[in-house]
């Protein structure tokens, strides 16, 4: 599926399914008998806040949580259904977790991400033993000298980097007809909900891994839909930050005007936590200066349980026809939003907006060629 076409035709359905919690179960999700329990820690749908509570109480440690995720990756990403969402594991993840546990025992907790495992897309530089290849065999052997700026911010916040996720090669700019979730280095990533269906891209690995609970949180990158499309397909919360809120330094580029990394998580609250942790002014990326005085380190303060009250939400009428199961789920989601105070407005096909897709992608191609 072309992710731009998906954005036009599929994202509202994804929002609806997520809103009512009725998305089909991912491989190993609650109620599934597909995976064998190997740990007392239930990672399915667990939040940052819940993990922090377990570490604070001493029930778990960053090391035990990290090991639990690594075992889950072994069971369903590298075996079983072989989701193939992770292109490389970090050999230093346990030692990182040990250091963060030591800090906690000494009374230092950096913040809500202290000791929390994370996966990042393989076009984001990490100054460690892992490669940064954008999924391409052409870059095999490429080790970054230092972290991307946003990776530095996240490490400073206390994350445990589990590894790197697969992607549509070169962030889906390998060709004008590339395949979502496939790279020459990593192979084809699968959707954890329906193994033979498209996981969308280009942040396919982050979407699949997040949906399968292979990490507490994930990071993707987006030029034109590469965070929000796989997030929607995989029932995640994806945010494309305003360009400049997160630095682009150290991320393999496509467009100087549209590229950015962004959060991909299981919940809105976790996305807000991750969004704040990644912000910061970077001297090497002048556009981040635009965020001075406009950004914050804690976006959770803007979360409101009654946030839909008084809001008008438009839904194209075309989404209310077709597959009866999907239509039923979407209408149920519409009802939930209405009970939360939103007004649902059914609108005709927004043809003028859809016409923007072609010139936009041409502009991205121009950006890519001009560097």
What are these regions (language model features)?
Residues 1-14:
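N-terminal secretory signal peptides and thylakoid transit peptides that target proteins
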Residues 16-19, 33-224, 242, 335, ...:
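Gly/Ser-rich catalytic/binding loops embedded in alpha/beta enzyme cores
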Residues 20-25:
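C-terminal segment of classical bacterial N-terminal signal peptides
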Residues 28-29, 34, 240-333, 351-354:
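A short helix-breaking turn/cap at a secondary-structure junction
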Residues 66-67, 98, 298, 322-350, ...:
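Acyltransferase
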Residues 114-134, 297-316, 365-371:
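Short helix-loop capping/hinge segments that flank enzyme active sites or metal/cofactor-binding pockets
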Residues 133, 176, 180-183, 356-371:
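Charged, often glycine-rich, active-site loop that binds/positions anionic groups
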Residues 228-233:
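Structural signature of FAD isoalloxazine-binding scaffolds in flavoprotein oxidoreductases
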